[in-house]
Amino acid sequence: ELGAPANFTPVADVNINPQNPVINNRSFGEDPVRVSDKVIAYASGLESGRVLSVCKHFPGHGDTDVDSHKALPVLPFTRERLDSVELYPFKEAIRAGLSGMMVGHLQVPVIEPLSGLPSSLSRNVVYGLLTEELAFRGLIFTAALAMKGVSGNADLCLQALKAGNDMVLAPRNLKAEVPAVIGAVERGEFSREELDRKCRKVLTYKYALGLSRKPNIQLSGLGTRINTPQTRDLIRRLNLAAITVLNNKEHILPLHADKEMPPMALLEVGDAGETDALAGRLGKYTSLVRFRLRKGMTEAQERVLRDSLS
C-alpha cells in the first residue's frame, strides 16, 4: 500500500563490541544463533507481504569500533572466527532462502588480502565468498557508495559490478559512473553478458514483486489501516518481552498511575535531550527530579551530585 517494494533490513550483524558506534541497538543481539533466528523471522515477515528483505552488512559489521559511514573498519579475524560469529547469521539467511543481501564497506584481510579494498568492491568477498562458496543466488546490493568507507575509490559503480554486486546503492556522481561502466563494456574490461545477466536478475525480482503492474497506492487513511488495535497490542507485547529488569527493589515496578508514588530521581548520562521521552512518561506517575552526569565535571560538581542523590 505504501509503494515500498524493498526494505534494507534486517541487520544481521552480531553486536559483540560495546564500542561499536553504528550498529549497537540496530542489531538483534550478541548471540549468533539468536540473531539468526530473529533475522529469518523478520525477513520472512517482510517477504510474506511481498517486500524484498535485504540482510546486511555482509560479511559482518558487529565487532568494529569504526563507523563505515566515516572510515573503513577492519575485521582482523581468522576465517574460523568469521564462520562462527560474523558469517553465521548470513549463512542461515541464505539457507532459509531469503532474497536480498547488502555487502558492507569493511576490510577483511583473511578473505581480501589487498590492503584498503572494501569488501563491497572485493571480488573475493562478493563473488568468491557470497556467490560461489555460500551459494547465494538472490539480489546483491552494495551499501551506500557515498559512505567514507568506500568513497575514496575510483569508478565505484564499475568496481562494484565487477566484484559481483547486482545493484549499486546511492553513488555520489551517477552521471560520471554510467559512462565509466559503458566504456568498460566497450573496451572489453567488463562483459556485456555479465551486465545483461545482472539486468535480467533485477527485472526478475521486480516482476516477482509485482512491479510490472501499475501500483495501487492509497496513501489516504494509510496510517489508520496500519496502526490497528491489533498492531498496537503486538507492539506492546514485543516491548514487554524485550525488557530485562536487573533490579526491582521493593517491587516498585511496574509503576501504577492510580497508586501514590514517592518522588523519583532520574540520573541522565551524556547529552541533553536523549531521555526527554522517558522523563515525560515517568512524570505521569510521580514528581520527577532530573540529574545529569556530564563529561568533564569537576570533583566538586560530582560531589554535589552524589550528595543530592544520597
Stretches found by the model and what they are:
Residues 23-24, 111-112, 222-223:
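Flexible glycine/proline-enriched surface loops and loop-helix/loop-strand junctions
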Residues 9-11, 56:
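Structural motif
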Residues 1-6:
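Catalytic domains of carbohydrate-active enzymes, especially glycoside hydrolases
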Residues 21-29:
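Short acidic, glycine/Ser/Thr-rich loop/turn "cap" segments at secondary-structure junctions
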Residues 132, 153-310:
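Preference for extracellular/luminal or secreted protein segments
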Residues 13, 143-146, 266:
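Conserved acidic functional residues
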Residues 30-194, 201:
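Second-shell residues forming the walls of enzyme active-site clefts
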Residues 12-22:
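Short, conserved phosphate-binding/catalytic loop or strand-edge motifs used
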